[in-house]
Amino acid sequence: MQDEYYMARALKLAQRGRFTTHPNPNVGCVIVKDGEIVGEGYHQRAGEPHAEVHALRMAGEKAKGATAYVTLEPCSHHGRTPPCCDALIAAGVARVVASMQDPNPQVAGRGLYRLQQAGIDVSHGLMMSEAEQLNKGFLKRMRTGFPYIQLKLGASLDGRTAMASGESQWITSPQARRDVQLLRAQSHAILTSSATVLADDPALTVRWSELDEQTQALYPQQNLRQPIRIVIDSQNRVTPVHRIVQQPGETWFARTQEDSREWPETVRTLLIPEHKGHLDLVVLMMQLGKQQINSIWVEAGPTLAGALLQAGLVDELIVYIAPKLLGSDARGLCTLPGLEKLADAPQFKFKEIRHVGPDVCLHLVGA
């Protein structure tokens, strides 16, 4: 039970990095000697010291003969920072308990093997499902080359997203919109369509003022990382004056042809081929994976939502349901043309159901 207690602490520490570590994974480390925590830390940003280094610095000489609990296999390769294995070995740690092996081919068990070769008692697998859930985007990209895609939808009880006129502000409650801010902040990128930009002129930023007090305390406003905004714009309809281009952070456009207009330095273009007359979403996701994008939060209209679902690219649905009815003339949730049989419908299973103010939030994953 002691091992579980300390690993749970390491996982809690790792969660603190979920807004800032991209493209790196979230990692926490706790160092224990004689039943006392002598050092702890978590990875805060890519290029900065890893969790083990922070914990070892805190532990100092007390790390000798201690046990290190780490949520991810310590790295053994030289990246932007030195290998954590070397630091653990040099500190004289006697035992290392890792929650999960690193799926990164550069590590992939080599870290644990190196520690064993140095005479350290090594084990892994403790609370592995919790560690994998914390790094689902990193894991998906390492294993498949694709980012983890969360599709956010907001609807009425009868599955409608807007009135026939297009009026949609606001179907869901202020509490639901604040909840969205937190989930946006945890994402590496936010994806939308040119149709949504033209219709709503959204900023698609994380608004620090709408985050909960605990998150604000951990992350002062000046440390807030804005997710990369990605716009699918195959016809080059979005202009440099749209709000999404003017916000802090980067805006990427997925296009099928170059755009010759003058854009701010924070704008980047990805040229993607067409497939059946539309921008190829599968190729786009492959390209984003190559750009080390771990996770994508999608906020778009029914056309892009439906296209992602039909392409089998959605890993998780997050649906906010408001307790109101909009009627049969209102706009639907997703455009899924060509569905004739129930067997052809995209299938999901419920993962979590929670109340958010007066609304309900459904979390669903692929069946």
UniProtKB/Swiss-Prot annotation:
Residues 146-367 are annotated as: Reductase. Residues 1-123 form the CMP/dCMP-type deaminase domain. The active site is at residue 52. It catalyses: 2,5-diamino-6-hydroxy-4-(5-phosphoribosylamino)-pyrimidine + H2O + H(+) = 5-amino-6-(5-phospho-D-ribosylamino)uracil + NH4(+); 5-amino-6-(5-phospho-D-ribitylamino)uracil + NADP(+) = 5-amino-6-(5-phospho-D-ribosylamino)uracil + NADPH + H(+). GO terms for molecular function: 5-amino-6-(5-phosphoribosylamino)uracil reductase activity; diaminohydroxyphosphoribosylaminopyrimidine deaminase activity; NADP binding; zinc ion binding. Pathway: Cofactor biosynthesis; riboflavin biosynthesis; 5-amino-6-(D-ribitylamino)uracil from GTP: step 2/4; Cofactor biosynthesis; riboflavin biosynthesis; 5-amino-6-(D-ribitylamino)uracil from GTP: step 3/4. Substrate binds at residues 168, 184, 204, 207, 299. Keywords: Hydrolase, Metal-binding, Multifunctional enzyme, NADP, Oxidoreductase, Riboflavin biosynthesis, Zinc. Signal peptide: none annotated. InterPro entries: APOBEC/CMP_deaminase_Zn-bd, CMP_dCMP_dom, Cytidine_deaminase-like, DHFR-like_dom_sf, Eubact_RibD, RibD_C, RibDG_C, Riboflavin_Biosynth_HTPR. In the N-terminal section; belongs to the cytidine and deoxycytidylate deaminase family. In the C-terminal section; belongs to the HTP reductase family. Homodimer. Converts 2,5-diamino-6-(ribosylamino)-4(3h)-pyrimidinone 5'-phosphate into 5-amino-6-(ribosylamino)-2,4(1h,3h)-pyrimidinedione 5'-phosphate. This is Riboflavin biosynthesis protein RibD. It comes from Escherichia coli (strain K12). The lineage of its organism: Bacteria, Pseudomonadati, Pseudomonadota, Gammaproteobacteria, Enterobacterales. The gene is ribD.
